[in-house]
Amino acid sequence: NIEEILNSTHKGVEASKIISKSNYGEILELCRQTAGCYIHSTDPRKTFEVTEQERLEFWEKLYAEPGFGIWQGNFSDMLTDRTANALMSAFLAEKIRSRVNDPAVAERLIPKDHGFGTRRVPQETGYYETFNRDNVHLVDINENPLREIIESGVRTDSSDIPFDVLIYATGFDAITGAFERIDIEGLGAKKLREFWQDGPVTYLGVLVADFPNMFICMGPHSGLGNYTRTAEYSVEWVSDLIEYVVENQKARVNTTEAGMDEWTSHVMSLGEGLLANEIGSWMTGVNRNLADKQKPKIMRYSGGHPAYREFCDKVKEEGYRNIVCT
């Protein structure tokens, strides 16, 4: 009962806890079955298999709903077909124009260097309306680059902009960045950061040949999707492997070069044709602050998490194929 919960009565709070947990199992099982481990499944239809009216009605429905449905529950070719993606991006551009009063500001807010869904999707409520406020001003640093931080704020090419508070949002060095910050050294004094210089190579996104007992959870080449759900499986799989090693009185876990090459090739093959892998973003390992991370690379397993689990489970069933325990 909403009134009870809003009134914060003991009874209402306790009832809300019971109600919210009543379908946990169903939700978790649904997430296990979808490619991205969300509650949404890709629509099997393609963008141009429906009429324009049907397409617009479908998109309006997705746009009005909360959550990742517009990204994870869209037409099946939305992230692989350029024309389909451009059409979806144009639909969203019109939504931005309708919500932002100043046409010039609206145009600045419409992405020009990537299509919808090829970078992390913003889940917002009232974000675009923020730019209709008198005390909010948008500066496009592509048109007016930042030059330096000064005592009163920031300096751009054209002016000094004063601030009371400056919040840094410079991005993050994702996928491989955390591993490269550590001086990880394997057999034969092999450095991981040097070994991955041209892109990561792994076995299942878990092991790297000649780096024994280094277990990676949620790093490159692992199952892409809802990290809370995918991380759970990754940790459980690695835990089972460690338990297997202990039970068999082994001390070192390594993978074979052949297994690593096979898996990496599989990841590369699955990533071909995915529009997101052509775009510079954290998901493709691009960090504009680092000179050696300017070009997008295929960093993630994109075959869907159910397929990833099936592959890893089969490796386990076969006595940990391509994994050497000594």
Regions from the language model: what does each represent?
Residues 1-326:
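N-terminal FAD-binding dinucleotide-binding subdomain shared by FAD-dependent oxidases/monooxygenases
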